[in-house]
Amino acid sequence: MTNSNRIKLTWISFLSYALTGALVIVTGMVMGNIADYFHLPVSSMSNTFTFLNAGILISIFLNAWLMEIVPLKTQLRFGFILMVLAVAGLMFSHSLALFSAAMFVLGLVSGITMSIGTFLITQLYEGRQRGSRLLFTDSFFSMAGMIFPMVAAFLLARSIEWYWVYACIGLVYLAIFILTFGCEFPALGKHAQHSQAPVAKEKWGIGVLFLAVAALCYILGQLGFISWVPEYAKGLGMSLNDAGALVSDFWMSYMFGMWAFSFILRFFDLQRILTVLAGMAAVLMYLFITGTQAHMPWFILTLGFFSSAIYTSIITLGSQQTKVASPKLVNFILTCGTIGTMLTFVVTGPIVAHRGPQAALLTANGLYAVVFVMCFALGFVSRHRQHSAPATH
C-alpha cells in the first residue's frame, strides 16, 4: 500500500468520526427550532431523534457482516447518495414521518461510515500506534462537536432555517466521497480469508461485562448531559449563543484532552487511571449542575478534559481482556456504547417532560457514578495486566 493511499484512508477514518459527532452533538442546538417548526413540545420532539440513534446502532451492528459482502468503497459512495436524499428530505418536507425517516437514514449512513473508519484504522496501524491513532481519530468526533454547535448558533441567530445545519454537515460526507476516488481499500470476506490464520477461541471473563455496562452508561450519560445543556442553560436565562458556547467549550476541551491523554496514558496502569478519571468526571458534572452561572464554563471545560479518555480506555481495556484482541469483543463493547446513544432521548425525554432539563442532567450524573463503580470493580477481575506483561520486555 502506498503512503498516499494510507493517508487518504486515514483521513476517511477521521472524517467518518467527525460526521457522526456532528450529527449526534448538534441535536441539542437545533431541537428547540425543529420543535417550533413542527409545532411540538421539545420533550416530544426529542423522541424523533431516537430514529437517528437507532439507525447508527443498526448499521454498526449489521456492518460487521455487510463489510464482507459489499466493498467498502461502494458502501461509502452509496452512502453519499443516501446522505443527499436525507438532507433533501429535511429541506423540502413538512411531514414529521418523513423527518423521522430522514433521521433514520442519516443514522444508517453515519453508523456505516464510522464502522468503516474504525476498521480502516485497525487494519492500517499496529500495536501502540493503533491505540494512539484510534484516540486521535476519536478526537475528530469532539472536533465536530466543537465546530458544528457554533455553526448552528451562527445560522439560527440569523433566522436561517435549522435544516441548513444538516446541509453543512453533509459537506463532511462530500469530502469523504471525494477521497474515495483513486483510493484502494483493504480486501475483505472471501478475498482476505486465505491470508488469515484461525484464531483460538478464548473466554471473555466477567471484566468484559463490567466494561460493557460502563460503555453503555458512559455514552448514555454523556449524550444525555450534553444534549440538554443548551435547554438547561436557556432556562437559567442564558442566550442561545452562550448556551451553544458551553457545548462547544465541552467538546473543545474534550478534543484537547484526547490529544493530551494519548501521551499521558502510557505512563499509568490503564484500569487505575480510568477509575480516577471516571470519579473526577462524576464530581465535575455534579459541580456544573449545582454551581453558579459564573462557574459553569470552567466546570464544563474541566469535565470535557478529564472525561475525554474514558470511552477509548474502556474499549482498549476490553481488547486486553483476551490474549489475542478479539474484533467481536471490541464490537460488543462498541455496540453497548451505541445502545447508550440510541437510548439517549428514550430515557431523558420523559424525564425532561415531567421534571425539567436539570433532572436529565442529574440522571446523567448518576450514570457517570455507575461508570466509576464498574471501573473500580474491574480492578478485581481485569486480565489486562497478565496479558500485557509478556509484551513488556
From Swiss-Prot:
- Does the keyword field hold Ion transport? no
Q: Name one Pfam family in it.
A: MFS_1
| Membrane topology according to the record | Multi-pass membrane protein
Q: Which domain of life does the protein's organism represent?
A: Bacteria
Could you list the residue ranges that cross the membrane? Answer: 11-31, 51-71, 78-98, 101-121, 134-154, 162-182, 206-226, 245-265, 273-293, 298-318, 332-352, 361-381
- Give UniProt keywords alphabetically: Cell inner membrane, Cell membrane, Membrane, Transmembrane, Transmembrane helix
What are the subcellular locations of this protein?
Cell inner membrane
Write out the GO MF terms.
transmembrane transporter activity
State where it is primarily located. membrane
- One cellular component term from this protein's GO annotations in UniProt: plasma membrane
Family annotation (InterPro entries): MFS, MFS_dom, MFS_trans_sf, MFS_TsgA, MFS_TsgA-like
Please give the coiled-coil regions recorded for this protein: none
Q: Which family does it belong to?
A: Belongs to the major facilitator superfamily. TsgA family.
| Listed name of the protein | Protein TsgA
- Give the species: Salmonella gallinarum (strain 287/91 / NCTC 13346)
Gene name for this UniProt entry: tsgA
